[in-house]
């Protein structure tokens, strides 16, 4: 239906509102009409601001799925809706469509005023507010005229704390929710005010233009006078651009117009979407969805390919025997940036510039609007950067920080600081922004996205001359063989770069896409198995101790593959449980996750699990690793997780999980449906499997050169409970049928031949010993060999080498002869599974070394050795008396004891070797069985082997040495290993004297030398992380090992 046919003429209020909200901007109404001649006009004034949350936001939040996933609980009565049993997705669509339909009929076709409040984070036309939670908190404290040290003032300023001073707040991590609690106690209005959506937009435009508290405070006072507490809460959410209404921009855009998402992808403009696509029946032509000058677009991204060889990596690029060439570029550690330039005689220098980041943030204010912009950090230096024939262009590249003093790239975190400094002091040496260009997408009004990379590169080299260390074309290497990758990767390792990007020169530019035309390659680190995994959070577990009452660990899922969805076997949101993550989170990470998921968690009901969305290990019956609460994937967040390896596990529905997972960072830039899926996981698993086979092959080669010095560790077998599937159980022929039977039947079913008297521990004649055995169910034979033909196994018993025994040993050297001590030990053992006061005795023990008079085979001797520890103490049996204890203790030499100084935290054993208690193996087992060690400082560094790198001796006043000593103690306390060899380290900590230019220079020099040494290693060998001392400090402070990437040294 064509909405223009029903359009009405604007009434007086609508005309006044149009002038009010659009006439005070950077463009006048006449200029707006010139730019958008067909923009729609509303026939009536906009809805009250309260209608926005009463009929849209609140119903969306209340629209929650049932745990079974079939129907939904609709909006609460009185909040703009009614109860319904349609699907969650349909209910959500109906809420949004109903609001849009009402707007079109009651207000008009100009939906832009509402859309910019619904999607404030996508509104590029309004300037930035420059307001964070703490600043808004200070303003509200002054507006309400309360003491910032009062309970409410304190709660506003400390909104991340779990309850402020009173400990009763439920809005921990949610600043807007905390504002609602505080404002509701002293609101100027009980009911919503009269401000319309247009009025709020006008005030927000003023707020964005305001600079400093003196201009911001009167605007907040006006909001406070005219809004109630709930309106203020939603206003704060809009200012912070954090709506949390349970629907994404994709949903709103697609419901507004079928082409809205496509137009937004190439323009990043809500204004264009609303003003050009107000008629649902109007469709865009293909050329209208292409890139345009001075309109931000979504760039192409590089794919990460988890392959085992360079050959496979290159093959995935799509090269062929006929066209084997591919390109290799350095992956830069900076910020992805697109630059637009157009001729404009109205600005100094004749050319106008615009800069946007990958997330569509406008950085023109920072890098410059024109060649004559005296406040620019970059464009004032670009007078000779382009060929004279260039009228306009669009470039794609990376903005990095370059230190001109050392002529090297420095970490990305310094970029904005360097740019601000260059604005003030354009000729100053030191760090500066450098724009490295690698693609051109438009030249002299001609879009180039459909041209090949080869053609685009030729156009780039003709159009861009460059300015040294200001704007440069990123160099690349042409290659035809996979062998070309390794030496270049060595070089980027030595230069502390991020990695490489491989590109297919025959590929077109794919807007808003990530595919195999561009593939990134990163070096692997010792503590990880490669690229971090981006998984969607589907469940949460409440913590204890200092994390009590809050979610301290999270269950992550892997999305089902498209094949499952298309076949109808799973919903689009179905995830399989994969890993439980609790380590690596800072306090601010927990607060951020709470901030983005507040109100979306639901209690886990074992009787009605949400199987449409989450499948646990063990299915509905067993529900392994079931969380305390769960969340829909579409309502959740994506987190980046790294780990030591992948391992099989029936505890998770994937059948696999990560060993020792650790949180790396929150991926707010990734939607839930871009997180790891089953197909991507299978590629990863195949890579890890191939790498593991290669590693084992190398170990086997090394083992052939080196004879084994220790026998292999065997699993312990509980006496009387031998594994029926094992062919070499501890007691294959004497295991009892029922271990709980009375001792009078202890030897029932066993056959004995007593060959001599008993000497130890009890003296007993041969007849007396035979009677003892018969009294307890055993059968006595006078010959060892069975001539009955029944296949009986007869156990010879002897304590002296009498003639019969000597003859037997000579005739049958492979036969085992058992001492009477075994009979006595079995009889005095307490029966298992009985109470101590019942005093029931009698239990068949596995043979031990003291039970063997003669061992007929190596296998018997080994099994007997496995039944006791290295001191001879039985695993299955109690000590008989004090004499036996004394004998064991006398056999303990002083070398067997491990002092603190001799303990090797790396191996979890004493340095003297042996088969003693393996602590790391024990702790690993605990974690794999679900016991969390994340809160224990004494184990936080246990997988870290740390090499400390300090300035040369004689430099400084010993401050670096003192600092290193403290950091080493943190590592040791956390059960880490301080090593003296770089080759064995997982982490290298660079420690210099207190901050200053000289210490920064020392840090860079030390880090550069270390990276050069590491780059000489055999390619494929994992690398240690080279970090600053602050990594140890902050990890200690947070009580968990934090992500290393924020602390890169050099």
Curated annotation (Swiss-Prot):
Catalytic activity: ATP + (deoxyribonucleotide)n-3'-hydroxyl + 5'-phospho-(deoxyribonucleotide)m = (deoxyribonucleotide)n+m + AMP + diphosphate
Keyword tags: ATP-binding, DNA damage, DNA recombination, DNA repair, Ligase, Magnesium, Metal-binding, Nucleotide-binding, Nucleus, Repeat
Domain BRCT intervals: 742-840, 936-1049
Domain of life, per lineage: Eukaryota
CDD domains: Adenylation_DNA_ligase_IV, OBF_DNA_ligase_IV
SUPFAM superfamilies, per database record: ATP-dependent DNA ligase DNA-binding domain (SSF117018), BRCT domain (SSF52113), DNA ligase/mRNA capping enzyme, catalytic domain (SSF56091), Nucleic acid-binding proteins (SSF50249)
Recorded family membership: Belongs to the ATP-dependent DNA ligase family.
NCBIfam families noted in UniProt: dnl1
Record-given protein name: DNA ligase 4
Protein's organism: Neurospora crassa (strain ATCC 24698 / 74-OR23-1A / CBS 708.71 / DSM 1257 / FGSC 987)
Lineage: Eukaryota, Fungi, Dikarya, Ascomycota, Pezizomycotina
């Amino acid at each position: 239906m064509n909405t223009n046919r029903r359009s009405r003429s604007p009434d007086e209020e609508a005309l006044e509102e149009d002038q009010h909200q659009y006439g005070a901007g950077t463009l006048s109404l006449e200029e707006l009409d010139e730019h958008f001649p067909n923009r729609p006009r509303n026939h009536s004034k906009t809805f009250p601001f309260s209608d926005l949350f009463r009929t849209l936001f609140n119903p969306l939040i209340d629209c929650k799925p049932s745990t079974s996933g079939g129907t939904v609980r609709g909006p609460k009565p009185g909040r703009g809706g009614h109860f319904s049993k349609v699907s969650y997705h349909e209910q959500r669509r109906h809420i949004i469509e109903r609001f849009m339909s009402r707007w079109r009929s009651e207000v008009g076709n100009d939906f832009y005023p509402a859309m910019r409040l619904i999607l404030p984070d996508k509104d590029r036309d309004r300037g930035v507010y420059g307001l964070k939670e703490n600043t808004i908190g200070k303003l509200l404290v002054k507006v309400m005229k309360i003491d910032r040290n009062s309970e409410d003032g304190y709660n506003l300023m400390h909104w991340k704390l779990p309850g402020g001073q009173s400990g009763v707040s439920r809005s921990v991590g949610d600043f807007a929710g905390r504002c609602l609690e505080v404002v509701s106690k002293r609101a100027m209005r009980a009911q919503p005010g009269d401000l319309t959506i247009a009025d709020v937009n006008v005030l927000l435009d003023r707020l964005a233009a305001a600079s400093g508290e003196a201009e911001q405070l009167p605007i907040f006072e006006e909001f406070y006078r005219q809004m109630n507490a709930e309106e203020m809460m939603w206003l704060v959410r809009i200012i912070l651009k954090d709506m949390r209404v349970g629907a994404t921009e994709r949903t709103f855009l697609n419901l507004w117009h079928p082409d809205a998402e496509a137009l937004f992808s190439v323009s990043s403009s809500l204004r264009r979407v609303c003003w050009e696509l107000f008629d649902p029946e109007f469709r865009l032509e293909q050329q209208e969805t292409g890139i345009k000058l001075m309109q931000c677009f979504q760039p192409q991204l590089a794919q990460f390919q988890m392959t085992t060889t360079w050959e496979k990596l290159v093959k995935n690029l799509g090269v062929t025997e006929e066209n084997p060439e591919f390109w290799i570029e350095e992956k830069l550690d900076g910020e992805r940036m697109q630059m637009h330039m157009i001729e404009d005689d109205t600005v100094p220098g004749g050319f106008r510039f615009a800069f946007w980041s990958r997330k569509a943030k406008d950085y023109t204010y920072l890098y410059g609007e024109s060649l004559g912009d005296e406040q620019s950090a970059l464009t004032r230096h670009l007078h000779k950067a382009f060929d004279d024939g260039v009228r306009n262009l669009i470039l794609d590249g990376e903005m990095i920080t370059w230190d001109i003093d050392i002529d090297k790239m420095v970490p990305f975190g310094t970029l904005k600081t360097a740019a601000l400094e260059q604005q003030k002091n354009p000729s100053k040496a030191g760090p500066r922004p450098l724009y490295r260009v690698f693609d051109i997408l438009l030249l002299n009004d001609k879009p180039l996205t459909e041209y090949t990379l080869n053609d685009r590169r030729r156009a780039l080299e003709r159009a861009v001359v460059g300015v040294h260390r200001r704007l440069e074309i990123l160099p690349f290497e042409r290659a035809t063989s996979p062998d070309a990758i390794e030496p270049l990767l060595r070089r980027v390792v030595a230069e502390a770069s991020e990695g490489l990007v491989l590109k297919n020169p025959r590929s077109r530019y794919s807007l808003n896409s990530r595919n195999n035309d561009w593939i990134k390659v990163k070096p692997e680190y010792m503590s990880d198995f490669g690229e971090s995994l981006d998984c969607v959070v589907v469940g949460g577990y409440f913590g204890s101790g200092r994390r009590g009452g809050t979610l301290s660990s999270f269950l992550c899922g892997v999305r089902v593959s498209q094949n499952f969805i298309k076949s109808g076997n799973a919903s689009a949101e179905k995830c399989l449980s994969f890993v439980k993550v609790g380590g690596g989170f800072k306090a601010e990470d927990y607060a951020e996750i709470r901030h983005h998921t507040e109100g979306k968690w639901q209690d886990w009901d074992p009787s009605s699990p949400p199987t449409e969305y989450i499948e646990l290990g063990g299915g509905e019956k067993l529900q392994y690793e079931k969380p305390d609460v769960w969340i829909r994937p579409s309502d959740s967040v994506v987190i980046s997780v790294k780990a030591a390896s992948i391992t099989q596990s029936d505890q998770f529905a994937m059948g696999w999980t990560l060993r020792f997972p650790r949180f790396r960072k929150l991926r707010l830039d990734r939607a839930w449906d871009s997180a790891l899926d089953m197909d991507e996981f299978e590629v990863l698993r195949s890579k890890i499997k191939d790498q593991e086979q290669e590693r084992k092959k190398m170990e086997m080669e090394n083992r052939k050169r080196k004879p084994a010095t220790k026998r292999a560790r065997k699993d312990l077998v509980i006496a009387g409970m031998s594994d029926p599937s094992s062919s070499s159980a501890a007691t294959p022929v004497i295991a009892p049928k029922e271990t709980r039977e009375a001792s009078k039947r202890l030897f029932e079913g066993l056959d004995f031949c007593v060959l001599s008297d008993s000497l130890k521990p009890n003296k007993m004649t041969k007849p007396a010993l035979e009677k003892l055995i018969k009294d307890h169910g055993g059968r006595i034979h006078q010959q060892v060999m069975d001539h009955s033909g029944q296949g009986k196994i007869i156990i010879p018993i002897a304590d002296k080498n009498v003639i019969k025994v000597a003859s037997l040993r000579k005739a049958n050297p492979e036969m085992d002869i058992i001492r009477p001590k075994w009979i006595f030990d079995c009889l005095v053992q307490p029966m298992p599974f009985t109470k101590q006061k019942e005093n029931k005795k009698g239990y068949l023990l596995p043979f031990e070394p003291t039970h063997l008079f003669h061992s007929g085979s190596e296998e018997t001797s080994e099994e007997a050795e496995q039944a006791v520890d290295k001191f001879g103490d039985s695993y299955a049996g109690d000590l008989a008396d004090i004499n036996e204890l004394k004998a064991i203790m006398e056999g303990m030499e002083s070398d067997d004891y491990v002092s603190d100084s001799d303990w090797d935290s790396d191996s979890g054993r004493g340095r003297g070797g042996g088969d003693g208690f393996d602590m790391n193996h024990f702790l690993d087992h605990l974690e794999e069985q679900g016991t969390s060690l994340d809160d224990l400082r004494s184990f936080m560094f246990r997988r870290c082997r740390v090499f400390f790198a300090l300035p040369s001796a004689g430099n400084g006043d010993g401050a670096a040495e003192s600092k290193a000593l403290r950091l080493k103690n943190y590592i040791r306390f956390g059960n880490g290993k301080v090593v003296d060899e770089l080759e064995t380290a997982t982490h290298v900590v660079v420690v210099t004297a207190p901050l200053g230019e000289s210490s920064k220079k020392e840090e860079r020099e030390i880090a550069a030398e270390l990276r050069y040494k590491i780059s000489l290693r055999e390619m494929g060998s994992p690398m240690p992380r080279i970090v600053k001392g602050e990594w140890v400090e902050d990890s200690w402070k947070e009580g968990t090992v934090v992500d290393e990437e924020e602390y890169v040294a050099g």
